[in-house]
C-alpha cells in the first residue's frame, strides 16, 4: 500500500529524481525563472523553498548544507548573497507556479516557476519624439 508516502516518482528511480531536482533548483536560482512540466514544478517547490529559508541565515554550516544539496558553488553564492537577503522579511512562499498551456509533442501540462520578488528585465522604450529629433539633426 502507498499510504503516507509523499512525493511523486515521475517515472524515474531515486538517483535520477534527486539529480533532476538538484539541476532544476540550481537552474531556478541561477535564472530566477524556468519552464517545466506542472508535476515537476510542484515537486521543485518542495526542494527549492527550504533552500531559500536556509539562505536567510548565512553561516558556514548552512552554506555547506546548501552546497551538499545543490553541488554548484556559483549558485550557492548567489543563493546566500542575493536571494537570502531579498526574502529576509518573507515567511515562506518564495516561488510562483503559473500554468502555461500544454506541450505540443505529448500534451503534458506545462508551467513557469519563478521567484516571487524577482526583478523584471527593464525594457528600453524610446519615444517617437526623440527619434524624430535625432533624424532632423
Swiss-Prot record:
One of its GO terms (biological process) is translation. SUPFAM superfamilies: Prokaryotic ribosomal protein L17. InterPro entries: Ribosomal_bL17, Ribosomal_bL17_CS, Ribosomal_bL17_sf. PROSITE patterns: RIBOSOMAL_L17. Keywords: Ribonucleoprotein, Ribosomal protein. One of its GO terms (cellular component) is cytosolic large ribosomal subunit. GO terms for molecular function: structural constituent of ribosome. It comes from the Bacteria. Part of the 50S ribosomal subunit. Contacts protein L32. HAMAP family: Ribosomal_bL17. Belongs to the bacterial ribosomal protein bL17 family. This is Large ribosomal subunit protein bL17.
